[in-house]
């Protein structure tokens, strides 16, 4: 049997970090993942997927990711339930991350937000404005 989930998306808000009574760090965040198709209005919809990460990786997520950061998650789907304050049973489905990959530099998130607001940024990307001729490549 196989339970594996692989996601790439952007954080909807800054990650949260808590500790269990035993001192284990637990990080949580929500990832917005675009669907591969468009709706009737021609717009792409997204799924908002809750992710849980533990120990040192939870600290790293808190320190290096923020709202809008692009991240890759490799983990497993898990369901759990609890009774809320009104005594009703609540079911939760989330991804428990085995690995979280930071897919862009930490400060790049702020640059992306500024670019989307109509401001352009000139970065130190060595691949910007390359004038290479690749026509002689065999593929």
UniProtKB/Swiss-Prot annotation:
One GO term (biological process): DNA replication
Domain of life assignment: Bacteria
Pfam families given in the database record: SSB
PROSITE patterns listed in its UniProt record: SSB
UniProt feature, compositional bias: Acidic residues: 129-139
Feature: compositional bias, Low complexity: 106-125
Key words, A-Z: DNA-binding
Domain SSB as annotated: residue spans: 1-104
Region (Disordered): 103-139
A GO MF term: single-stranded DNA binding
InterPro entries registered for this protein in UniProt: NA-bd_OB-fold, Primosome_PriB/ssb, ssDNA-bd
CDD domains given in the database record: SSB_OBF
Statement: the UniProt record of this protein carries the keyword DNA-binding: yes
Gene Ontology annotations for the cellular component aspect, listed alphabetically: nucleoid
Keyword presence, DNA-binding: yes
Subunit structure as annotated in this protein's UniProt entry: Homotetramer.
NCBIfam families: ssb (TIGR00621)
Protein name: Single-stranded DNA-binding protein 2
High-level lineage: Bacteria, Bacillati, Bacillota, Bacilli, Bacillales
